[in-house]
Amino acid sequence: MIVTETIIRFENVTKQFDNDPPVLDNVSFEIEKGKFYTLLGPSGCGKTTILRLIAGFLEASKGQIYLGDKVINQIPANKRPVNTVFQDYALFPHLNVYENVAFGLRIKKLKKEAIDEKVKEALRFVNLKGYEKREISEMSGGQRQRVAIARAIVNEPEVILLDEPLSALDLKLRTEMQYELRDLQKRLGITFIFVTHDQEEALAMSDEIFVLNKGEIQQSGTPIDIYDEPINKFVADFIGESNIVNGKMIQDFEVEFVERRFECVDQGFRPNEVVEVVIRPEDLEITSAEKGQLQVTVDWMLFRGVHYEVGCIDIDGNEWLVHTTRKVRVGDKIGLAFEPEAIHVMRLGETEEEFDKRLDSYDEVQ
């Protein structure tokens, strides 16, 4: 049996500025020790506000924030065992690499020998051994990122907060840093809480993801759970690309959409309940028109390197997006085939608690 330890807990936390609508609205969640978490959502969803509340840069309007079993609402930022890596890294340009990393230790008045040992160990962890005397202005974006992380881990915090730290990097370097951050977190065993609006980053790096929108957590879970079983239209559309159509759940394992009935793997709905149906683009296979479960016309096509992105329209005007390695032409009449497992049925207005309970019932039946 795996024993987990909760390191951070939000209980009914609200954050409101003046008389504006709440930036966070009655949010509750738990963060387990030693995992990589991502707060994912569009601009203004509240993800950075959560980070600042944990760091102590903001104070909650309502609710309690716990570190372990201790309420930390009134504890100042410099007294919390938390370090933040900012989007712009916030390095001191007049200090070299060594002094940037040593800065927090000097504030704590550690002995010179202890500082030297800790700084060199932190730089070794981020693969910057030998860069101690390098000026910040001489460092690349990726190297500055590593310096900022070394400065965070040198204080041996219980939690490291990362506020969109990869957003300023080019695509290749950003991908490399994703692997490095994930590897570093595993080696350190420290809880990482990472903020991003980039879905691919979240899916690639996280043990768990919190998807936020308009100050509320829409869904939390592993990357696979959230991608394969989105709770609502927002999550389905925000995490990856989706085909979403209105439908009706006829009975367990049978759903109707585009005026046809299909076998599915979903259950626990009321007979003839109005639902939304999701099929991912990579789960649609292009066939001849007569063999397809859906008959569509190719409207446009883009080459994306590893696959073609094909936009199609069915006879009712519904748009379908397909990811395929098969080349087609605009105007072609084709069929789209898919397995029952490719169909995901979403209940309108379902809460995360209700959603989890319904998924658990699937396991009980199996």
Curated annotation (Swiss-Prot):
<comment type="function">
    <text>Part of the ABC transporter complex PotABCD involved in spermidine/putrescine import. Responsible for energy coupling to the transport system.</text>
</comment>
<protein>
    <recommendedName>
        <fullName>Spermidine/putrescine import ATP-binding protein PotA</fullName>
        <ecNumber>7.6.2.11</ecNumber>
    </recommendedName>
</protein>
<keyword id="KW-0547">Nucleotide-binding</keyword>
<feature type="binding site">
    <location>
        <begin position="41"/>
        <end position="48"/>
    </location>
    <ligand>
        <name>ATP</name>
    </ligand>
</feature>
<dbReference type="InterPro" id="IPR017879">
    <property type="entry name" value="PotA_ATP-bd"/>
</dbReference>
<dbReference type="InterPro" id="IPR050093">
    <property type="entry name" value="ABC_SmlMolc_Importer"/>
</dbReference>
<dbReference type="GO" id="GO:0016887">
    <property type="term" value="F:ATP hydrolysis activity"/>
</dbReference>
<dbReference type="InterPro" id="IPR003439">
    <property type="entry name" value="ABC_transporter-like_ATP-bd"/>
</dbReference>
<keyword id="KW-1003">Cell membrane</keyword>
<dbReference type="InterPro" id="IPR008995">
    <property type="entry name" value="Mo/tungstate-bd_C_term_dom"/>
</dbReference>
<dbReference type="GO" id="GO:0043190">
    <property type="term" value="C:ATP-binding cassette (ABC) transporter complex"/>
</dbReference>
<dbReference type="InterPro" id="IPR003593">
    <property type="entry name" value="AAA+_ATPase"/>
</dbReference>
<dbReference type="InterPro" id="IPR017871">
    <property type="entry name" value="ABC_transporter-like_CS"/>
</dbReference>
<dbReference type="InterPro" id="IPR027417">
    <property type="entry name" value="P-loop_NTPase"/>
</dbReference>
<dbReference type="GO" id="GO:0015594">
    <property type="term" value="F:ABC-type putrescine transporter activity"/>
</dbReference>
<keyword id="KW-0472">Membrane</keyword>
<keyword id="KW-0067">ATP-binding</keyword>
<dbReference type="Pfam" id="PF00005">
    <property type="entry name" value="ABC_tran"/>
</dbReference>
<dbReference type="Pfam" id="PF08402">
    <property type="entry name" value="TOBE_2"/>
</dbReference>
<keyword id="KW-0813">Transport</keyword>
<dbReference type="InterPro" id="IPR012340">
    <property type="entry name" value="NA-bd_OB-fold"/>
</dbReference>
<comment type="subunit">
    <text>The complex is composed of two ATP-binding proteins (PotA), two transmembrane proteins (PotB and PotC) and a solute-binding protein (PotD).</text>
</comment>
<dbReference type="GO" id="GO:0005524">
    <property type="term" value="F:ATP binding"/>
</dbReference>
<dbReference type="InterPro" id="IPR013611">
    <property type="entry name" value="Transp-assoc_OB_typ2"/>
</dbReference>
<feature type="domain" description="ABC transporter">
    <location>
        <begin position="8"/>
        <end position="239"/>
    </location>
</feature>
<keyword id="KW-1278">Translocase</keyword>
<comment type="similarity">
    <text>Belongs to the ABC transporter superfamily. Spermidine/putrescine importer (TC 3.A.1.11.1) family.</text>
</comment>
